Each structure stands twice: as C-alpha cells, then as structure tokens.
Amino acid sequence: MALSSWIFFLLVHGIVGGSRTCFPGCRCIVDNFGLFHSFSLTKVDCSRVGPHVVPVSIPLDTSYLDLSSNRLKRINESVLSGPGYTTLMNLNLSYNQIVKISYSTFSKLRYLESLDLSHNLLETLPDGSFLYSRLTELDLSSNKIQKVGVGAFTLKSQGRSMTINLANNEIHSIFRGAERPVPNIHSLMLYGNQLLSVPDLHGIPLRHLNLDRNPLSKIEKVSFLGLESLTHLSLSDLPNLREVSPYSFKSLTSLLELDLSNNPNLKSLSSDMFFGLKALQELNLAYSGVASLPKDIMLHLPSMKSITWGENIRCLKTVKESIFHAQKGRVRKEVLLCHDDNGAVPAQDIL
C-alpha cells in the first residue's frame, strides 16, 4: 500500500494527540493513530520564527512543515534533507523572499504531495524542478515568474494528476522546452498574468483552465487544439478581448462550463464560435459587451442548461410541446425562459 493511502487510512481512524518538544520557536502537534496509538504523525509549525530557522531539525514522523513568513531568501537540498524529511507530505514556504530554486531543491522529498511557494520572488523554474516528488498540489502564485517551461512540471511518476496555481505572476510566455513527457496537469490557474495569446498547452490532460485577467485581445481558431479533456474554461475579465474566432472551441467536445463574463469590449459572437460544444451546459456572458446571441445558437449547444446574461439575466432551456399534429404527432421545441430580479424577460430580447 502506498504511503499516502496508508496515512489516509490512519487519518480516518485516528485521534488527535498532544504536543512534543520542538525546535526553538516552532510548535509541534502530534496526531496519534491506531487502536493503541501505535502510530503517530507530527505537524511542525515554524512560521514567523525568522531566517535563522533553517536548517530546522524535525521529528522523524513529520508529515507537515510550515516555514512560511520567515524572510527566507534561499532554500536548497541540504536544508530539506535529513531525518524527518523522509515522510514529509506537505511543505509551506509561502510569504518568504526566495528568489531561486534548482532541479535538486526538492529532490529528497520523495513523498511530497503539496507544496506552497506562493508570495515569493521566484523569476524562473528550472526544467524538472519537481521531478522526484509526488506532487498533486503546487502553488506558485504571486511570484515574479515571466517565462514557464512545461517541462518544469514533469514528474518521474506521472500517474497522479496535479493542480497548479501560477496566478498573479508576470508570465508572458509558456514554452515546451526540453523533450520530456507531457506533465499530468488536471487544473491550471493562469489568471492575473501578462499573456497576449492563449499558450500552447496541446496534449496536457487539463480539465480546468483559468485565463482570467490577462491582456488577451483575440481567441484564435487554434487556441484550444489538443485540449479535448477540458471541462471548465474561464475567460473572464479580459479588458482587451474584442474577438473570438469561429470554431475557436471546436475541439472542446467535453467542455461543460464556459465563462466569458466581464469582457466589455467583446461586442458580438458568431454561431460558428459555438461549433463543437456539444457537452456545454453553462455559458456565462454576464456584463459582457455582446448585445445579442445568434438566433441558431441552440443548434450548436444541445446540452445547454443555462445562459447568464447582461447585468443579472439568467436563461434556462426548457422543452415546449406544440399542439398535437395529425401526421407529426406532438412536436417538441427547445426554448429559452429568461428572468432577472424583476421577473420574466422575453427571450427575443436576447436572441
């Protein structure tokens, strides 16, 4: 049984224990598990101790280490190795002043699943930065990163999918870099960066992608090719967005939710823009500049359930049956029923 699965089992059947002697300035909380408390894991909180805290010695059974808010400027392999680091699953290095990591910085943390490097001063990510870990959650938000190579997120064991947060950096380029296996990224947050176009993420098994608050001006026909697994796409708060090309979403056959809200300079949408969105259930166009939708929009959106529109208008799809016809029987027709805070809104005002 994998270590993480065993620990999860113990967490379900365990009870909280007490504290133990800890590194000066740190706090150690022990969780005891098992029928006779025969197994324990320790959470070590060394936040706000100061830069002298590293290297910090930690108990052998440490699963969580918090080194946030310590004004740390560098962190390396020697700091994150030794007794106690073998079982480490969660490491918090947020709110420091770390300017650089290397491909070997986290190489000894073979069971690391969650890493928080947010609110630091990182500018680059070396290829294979996290290669030897078992990461499922990686937070790199609010740094100074400008360019990102996809190879930085390749793991030696590719079986587990990752959630990666790169929000609020200065990213203007995402490139393929060295030949490595495509990283297994499930969710990618890129909001609040400097991307002028949708990056090439071809082949990455993404299900969630957030590109909000970037200076994108146009969605191209090829922008989302190779992202057939995508189910949630957010393109909100794009002040420069003026055009979505026809067939831009044609490869997104699994997409369930599309957010195009708060795009005031997006004035119109063609019916061909919705081509291929057979699974789409929710479309958000709230506070956009689009005055009306194509009349035949529902032909391209057979699974649509709701459209959010204008300032606070929501349209729900329903099936309406006409009067019985001698030859055709009852004819079923899909229609939109719309309402706002004041009540019903005629669908013809929207279509």
From Swiss-Prot:
Q: What is its main location?
A: secreted
Q: What's the superkingdom here?
A: Eukaryota
Recorded phenotype for the gene knockout or disruption: Morpholino knockdown causes anterior neural developmental defects. Morpholino knockdown impairs neural crest formation. Morpholino knockdown results in impaired endoderm formation and mesoderm patterning.
Where in the sequence is the signal peptide annotated? 1-17
Single GO biological process annotation from the record: energy homeostasis
Which residue ranges contain the repeat LRR? Answer: 59-82, 85-108, 109-132, 134-155, 158-181, 182-203, 204-226, 252-276, 277-300
Location in or out of the cell: Secreted
Kindly name one Pfam family recorded for this protein. Answer: LRR_8
Keywords attached to this Swiss-Prot or TrEMBL record, sorted alphabetically, are: Developmental protein, Leucine-rich repeat, Neurogenesis, Repeat, Secreted, Signal
GO cellular component term of the entry, any: extracellular matrix
Tissue-specific expression: During embryogenesis, localized to the animal hemisphere during late blastula and gastrula stages. At stage 10, expression is also detected around the dorsal blastopore lip. Expressed in the mandibular crest segment, branchial crest segment and differentiating somites at stage 21/22. Expressed in the germ ring including the shield at shield stage and in the tailbud at the 10-somite stage.
Describe its assembly.
Interacts with bmp4. Interacts with dll1 (via extracellular region). Interacts with fgf8; inhibits fgf8 signaling. Interacts with nodal2/Xnr2; enhances nodal2 activity.
Q: What else is known?
A: This factor is named 'Tsukushi' because its expression pattern in chick embryos is similar to the shape of the Japanese horsetail plant, tsukushi.
Q: Which PANTHER family match?
A: SLIT RELATED LEUCINE-RICH REPEAT NEURONAL PROTEIN, TIR DOMAIN-CONTAINING PROTEIN
Q: What does this protein do?
A: Contributes to various developmental events through its interactions with multiple signaling pathways. Dorsalizing factor which functions as an inhibitor of bone morphogenetic proteins (BMP) during gastrulation. Promotes dll1-dependent activation of Notch signaling and is required for neural crest formation. Induces endoderm and dorsal mesoderm formation by enhancing nodal2/Xnr2 activity while inhibiting ventrolateral mesoderm formation through inhibition of fgf8.
Supply the name of the protein. Tsukushi-A
Q: Which organism is it from?
A: Xenopus laevis
Gene of this entry:
tsku.L
